[in-house]
Amino acid sequence: MVTDMCANYEPIAKNRIHLLDLFEPTFDYKADIFPNYSSPLLFAKAGNIEWRLARFGLVAPWVKDIKQVKNTYNARIETVASKPSFKNAWKKNQFCLIPVETIFEPKYIDGKAHWYGIYRTDGMPFTVAGIYEYAVVNGEEIRSMSMLTINVDTHPFLNQFHAPEDEKRSVVVIPPSRRNAWLHVTHDEAPDFLVEMPIDEYTAAPKNEMNKFRSNTH
């Protein structure tokens, strides 16, 4: 069975953006992001890196009714170049970074889903690879994005999430040394960046317990 990896995450806290050596955006945003919410992203424009607020769930330029847009918050790397919703952004090299504190995923224990947060062991925020799009729907300008995902069936840490019978998927983390390159990459070069998370750099904990030891994020 095919499943999406990330439908809920905690974006980077504004008071921690300096940890990425970035300037703070001028807009506000929610501390817990779900599909169709607006969230911050980074993209390159005229050689500069800029912040934008974007809808979590990509809206293709051909969309006439926003109600048509469903399940576009994750883009599978295996099909991103051919899927109607994503192929324009991919072929036009519209790559972005989504700075986050935590990714939330279900872990099944005794047949029941328990939500866990995946975060860096050193407590630092990190940046997720995405594609972005610009569309005008019924006269409204919409900037949107999707997180790229890869298969992680054999990843010893990430394969514990989602239902046992489901394919295991993961977002892609772009490390600090490759962030600028990712924002200027071509779609032919992009697959070289889409690799699994380093096993020893991430851990997980139940979502309902995380505020006990990660209260510094939001």
Where are the language model's segments positioned?
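Short linear sequence motif anchored by a di-proline
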Residues: 1-218
